[in-house]
Amino acid sequence: MIRGAWMYPREDEAVLKICWEPRHSDKPCADSERAQRWRMSLASLLFFTVLLSNHLWLVSAGAKARGSFTFSLQPANSSLLPPQSFPGEGRGCWDTFLSNLTKSAAQPPHCTGVRSTHLDTACAKLHYLQRHRGSFSPSYPQPSSWSSSYWSYPPSSFSSKRNFLKAYFRNYTLSFCDTYTILDLLLGMSNPDSLDCSLESLMEDFVGAAAASPALIEGEVCSSCIQAYQRLDQHAQEKYEEFDFVLEKYLQSGEYSVRSCVGDCKAVYKAWLCSEYFNVTQRQCRHRIPCKQYCLEVQTRCPFMLPDNDDLIYGGLPGFICTDMLENHMSNTEAECCDVRWHSCKTQGSGNHNTSTKSTDSRFKYYPHHQHHRDHHLHPYHHQHHQSLLPVSAGSRLGNTRLRLCVLVLMLLHTMASFSVVQNGVTLEPLPGLDDSSSHEE
């Protein structure tokens, strides 16, 4: 009895041990299922993280592209102007004015500091200031032998009046070539139509009006100069309209194979055309380049037209050719235009290259050179000192894509390595338990 009672519990333990033995082998399976669910959750989290990061990259890239058209150019000689000489003369107004230069044929913005629509009355307003506000009145009693010459004023008074004229005419621009202020024209192109339109002549016109002829009292010199500039501006607009007509004709005809971004072509052509009519330096820009650089931009961006060959699609000669491209000498008096970065419309998400010629909202700016409209001028020496203004290649876009792809691959590799470590840890964890059970059985 005692022996039987002693042996039966041991037999029960053996039976229970045999019954529960398979359950020890089920634990690794449960751990592997939990590890699998963990891997799936981690993979889903990684996937959504990649999508979110890609979305943030796209949003930041779009914001950067929109912010690249915000200009902060200031006049080079800003010390000539008092802070609040005229309404709207502050930095914000100039930023608005310069941002308008990115449009190939748009109207200038409403800005009280920069006016092109009231250019006809600019001389009358200046004459009004001379008569009623005493802007040009001498600060000391006039001598009896005072003549109409402005040289009778002391140097300090002469300098202040000259600065006032600069400040005044800096706030007026042309109608079509609206990237030019009247001050730029007076300083760089003082002889339109054989007229004397220098600042000294205008000072003699207004300062010496009291002792001069009645014609000078009415500001005839100022009005004549403004009208001469307006005639050149109108002539440039007529030439631009002729070019626009030809370009539209080629685009609307199905027998011509034009492949180009028309907004680019029209913007750079207007910039080059105005620079040919007005041989002046753009002074409100900090960084300037030779205006002849614009010629190559037109040749590069305007479409290649093949009206007599239906077989070729992307070949042929450009519709605009720059001559005298071997000219390599540099003149000290050469006009300089703003160093503009031309952003192709391809970078704006436009898939259709045959854009209508009426689309004039391309992101560009344009500035000045040369009075006569000749298809020439390019200085190769410029490329040694400034970045090229050639069309933006796909290198920058591909660089961003490659960067995102590399980051994605690295994240996937890291995830796979983490999964391998977790999987190895799960498979190795039940091994000590199996060794213990075998030792107990022994």
From Swiss-Prot:
Keyword terms = Glycoprotein, Membrane, Transmembrane, Transmembrane helix
Record InterPro entries: NALCN_aux_factor_1/2 (IPR055288)
Q: Where in the cell is it found?
A: Membrane
Location (main, coarse): membrane
Q: How does the entry describe its membrane topology?
A: Multi-pass membrane protein
Q: Which residues are glycosylated?
A: N77, N100, N171, N279, N354
Q: Which GO terms describe its cellular component?
A: membrane
Transmembrane stretches, start-end? 42-62, 406-426
- Keyword Membrane in record: yes
Q: Please explain the role this protein plays, according to its UniProt record.
A: Probable component of the NALCN channel complex, a channel that regulates the resting membrane potential and controls neuronal excitability.
PANTHER family to which the protein is assigned, alphabetical? NALCN CHANNEL AUXILIARY FACTOR 2, TRANSMEMBRANE PROTEIN FAM155
Similarity comment: Belongs to the NALF family.
This one is known as NALCN channel auxiliary factor 2
**Organism listed in the record:** Xenopus tropicalis (Western clawed frog)
Report which gene this protein is encoded by. Answer: nalf2
